Amino acid sequence: MKITVVLVLLATFLGCVMIHESEASTTTTSTSASATTTTSASATTTTSASATTTTSASATTTTASPSSSSKKKTVTHYKRKVKRPKKVRKITRRRGLRSRNGRSSRNRRSEE
């Protein structure tokens, strides 16, 4: 039931849009606009697997502006380095051996 209501509303909306588009196409309005944009980007990521990992990335963006008679190029270089710490090793408990205070687990209980 809910789906049919949604479909009816969608069909009504599309019908109104199509009628509006057909009315807009019959009027004689002429608009001309042109724009040219050239964008070039490259990214490089290098990761080394040593004790300290360094990641570097660079990107280059070139944009041409069509508004002036001579084309101007803007080149932007980005370079970023991230230094990551060494991997932390998990400390495991030594079970069954001596505890920190020097007594074994058998001697902890009081003698009866």
Swiss-Prot record:
User: Cellular component GO terms, alphabetically?
Assistant: extracellular region
Which residue ranges contain the repeat sequence?
31-38, 39-46, 47-54, 55-62
Show which residues constitute the signal peptide. 1-24
Report the main location listed first in the record.
secreted
Q: Where is this region: Disordered?
A: 24-112
Positions with biased composition (Basic residues): 70-112
Q: Where in the cell is it found?
A: Secreted
What residue spans carry the region label 4 X 8 AA tandem repeats of T-S-A-S-A-T-T-T? 31-62
What family is reported? To NG-1, also to SGS-3.
Name of the protein in its database record: Protein new-glue 2
Q: Which organism does this record belong to? A: Drosophila melanogaster (Fruit fly)
